[in-house]
Curated annotation (Swiss-Prot):
Pathway: Sulfur metabolism; glutathione biosynthesis; glutathione from L-cysteine and L-glutamate: step 1/2. One of its GO terms (biological process) is glutathione biosynthetic process. Belongs to the glutamate--cysteine ligase type 1 family. Type 1 subfamily. The keyword RNA-binding does not apply. The keyword Nucleotide-binding applies. Pfam families: Glu_cys_ligase (PF04262). NCBIfam families: glu_cys_ligase. It catalyses: L-cysteine + L-glutamate + ATP = gamma-L-glutamyl-L-cysteine + ADP + phosphate + H(+). Transmembrane segments: none annotated. It comes from Salmonella paratyphi C (strain RKS4594). The gene is gshA. This is Glutamate--cysteine ligase. One of its GO terms (cellular component) is cytosol. Its EC number is 6.3.2.2. One of its GO terms (molecular function) is metal ion binding.
Amino acid sequence: MIPDVSQALAWLEKHPQALKGIQRGLERETLRVNADGTLATTGHPEALGSALTHKWITTDFAEALLEFITPVDGDIQHMLTFMRDLHRYTARKLGDERMWPLSMPCYIAEGQDIELAQYGTSNTGRFKTLYREGLKNRYGALMQTISGVHYNFSLPMAFWQAKCGVTEGEAAKEKISAGYFRLIRNYYRFGWVIPYLFGASPAICSSFLQGKPTTLPFEKTDCGMYYLPYATSLRLSDLGYTNKSQSNLGITFNDLHEYVAGLKRAIKTPSEEYARIGVEKDGKRLQINSNVLQIENELYAPIRPKRVTRSGESPSDALLRGGIEYIEVRSLDINPFSPIGVDEQQLRFLDLFMVWCVLADAPEMSSDELLCTRTNWNRVILEGRKPGLTLGIGCETAQFPLPKVGKDLFRDLKRVAQTLDSIHGGEEYQKVCDELVACFDNPELTFSARILRSMIDEGIGGTGKAFGEAYRNLLREEPLEILQEEEFIAERDASVRRQQEIEAADTEPFAAWLAKHA
């Protein structure tokens, strides 16, 4: 089932320097909660500056949903330490609040209790909040409080020069983008390995269903927790952050221009379902527009091709201008065993898997085959640890045992690991392979099995409160390592100043401004 990558691996072993200079970035979301686990109702802490303009600390959907962002970094340990500093400083500024250590929220009785993220009075700020109003009215606020980790990854120019002979200019843009699309297609085919190993949301609080019927065969504990005994990541299931209305958009990952055309089509295609919500009611705007996507960021995807945008530029226009610059991996649940929601083992694994995905042959995929890849993902998400579980290839009927496919993949990853270790010294990447491959023979070692044991004993709420309290105490005590307190204060003040400048520069009324942007 695994493509034959022996030639590509042999090439890599002859050109190890092609992997020198991999760049990465990390984003982590987490809910602010009170000591009893309920959602914090306070505004974004003043000590953290402006959520609109702060470089490292912002908010996602809700005012209580923090998002931490590292700068681009070539060193995994340095990047994780930077992320830890963001957590350390924030933990000290949250008073009695703490950061929820799980992907799935708990103790939220009503979606109405969730305040949307606020970004001030500028047109840009109001637009961001209106977009979130649209998300709430389309999908419900509870779904939007699910947290995850995003991993941004780019290969060095030396890789593309060695692999494709690119230099600069239009031809380089096309070849590099084609290489990243190959990575993305392989990710859709084999990325289920990420929730298998690292999925950490095998259960949900009963309030999350809000009385809606479900066909999933949940087991229920006395404390009202619903779980699937072999599930890995309900966050990635249809219960979580997915969007069924997007499944027939026909967006494919074969060609830059095709992909962008599909994205642009989706933001211009009217939706009957969303038209029923209405765009405005009693003078209050309910969504930016009633199209399938309000804006491009609404496209749900487990992985995205990206390029840093210029001021006023849409993500797709940035891609057309310069091609794909990096990849955003979006399938990581919060790691409940780390105070910062992610750890070094995971990131080293993702490095290996990304390199494998770009090396392995990846035939073009129709939108139909893209839908078929969802079958494997759903099996792993809902019953990934089930004995005897099999996976297929695309829309074909042949089935293969998951443990065998996983071990075959890791045989290749071990060779990539040897190459990366030869550049950096040590055996860190090979160690990660040895640790993780054991999860295929013993699923009890996976994150989902480990956290489910705690959840069955303590409930989701009890587990979240215990872990959150322990991490709060730990982070508050640890000294900062990279950033200094003065730098946090300077960025707080600078972010507030930047927001004020944006607000002062706005002269157009929001309604007129929105008419141009909706």
